[in-house]
Design a protein with these regions (language model features):
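Helix-turn-helix
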Residues: 7, 11, 15, 19-49, ...
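Short coil/turn segments at alpha/beta junctions that flank glycine-rich nucleotide-binding fingerprints
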Residues: 18-22, 73, 94, 137
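Hydrophobic alpha-helical connector segments
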Residues: 53, 67-93, 149-152
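Secondary-structure edge/capping motif, primarily at the C-terminal ends of alpha-helices
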Residues: 69, 98-105, 163-166
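C-terminal peripheral helix-coil segments that are non-catalytic and often amphipathic
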Residues: 82, 89, 125-137, 154-155, ...
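Short secondary-structure transition hinges
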Residues: 88-128, 136
């Protein structure tokens, strides 16, 4: 039973990637999985439900990668930098390899928000842990780690669409590093700033 369900999810993932979630039908999926439509509908009531499971599969892979970054033994500031790079790396590989998810990220924000609820909860929890550790060690100057983490995630999301549209891996990496520097050190060059003169 579980094997059959996993097989359907894998086949659907491949088909959605190949011909898009909008064009693939339940009939196409049944044929590609070499099973009857009846068997397919025993496991999934609709294509929309199957799509949810396909994305859930991707979400689990994302959560594992983010968890690894959060669990690293680096100091809090370096851990946060690693985490941010991992976040955007995951978005890049997810949208680069999956046209159907890329389309949703770019044009269907409501569905993306629905699909990302679980990732968001996980991310806020992981980020809060990193920020709290940094605050306790005196590395980060923040009042409320959880609120700061929620705002940080909103900032990430505001950058994602431009990041996906650019689609240039090297340029995107440079942009993310610039944002990390901006967040960590600000935009002011203290040596030349008038704020520090008189």
């Amino acid at each position: 039973m579980i094997k059959t369900k996993s097989k359907i999810i894998d086949v659907a993932k491949g088909l959605f990637r190949e011909i898009s979630v909008y064009k693939a039908t339940m009939n196409d999926i049944a044929k590609a999985a070499k099973m009857s439509r009846r068997t397919l509908y025993t496991h999934f009531k609709s294509k929309e439900e199957l799509y949810k499971y396909v994305v859930e599969d991707e979400v689990n892979a994302i959560n594992e990668k983010l968890q690894k970054a959060a669990d690293s033994r680096l100091p809090p500031d370096r851990k946060l930098k690693l985490y941010i790079l991992q976040h955007f790396g995951v978005i890049d590989s997810l949208t680069r390899n999956n046209r159907y998810i890329r389309y949703d990220f770019l044009f269907n924000n409501i569905r993306v928000e629905h699909l990302r609820k679980e990732i968001d909860k996980k991310e806020i929890s992981l980020l809060t842990g990193i920020i709290r550790e940094g605050k306790e060690r005196g590395v980060f100057r923040v009042t409320d780690p959880k609120v700061f983490s929620q705002n940080l995630l909103l900032m990430f999301k505001s950058l994602e669409q431009a990041f996906i549209l650019t689609g240039h891996k090297e340029r995107n990496s440079k942009t993310v590093l610039e944002y990390i520097d901006l967040m960590f050190f600000g935009i002011i060059n203290t040596e030349n700033s008038n704020l520090h003169h008189g």
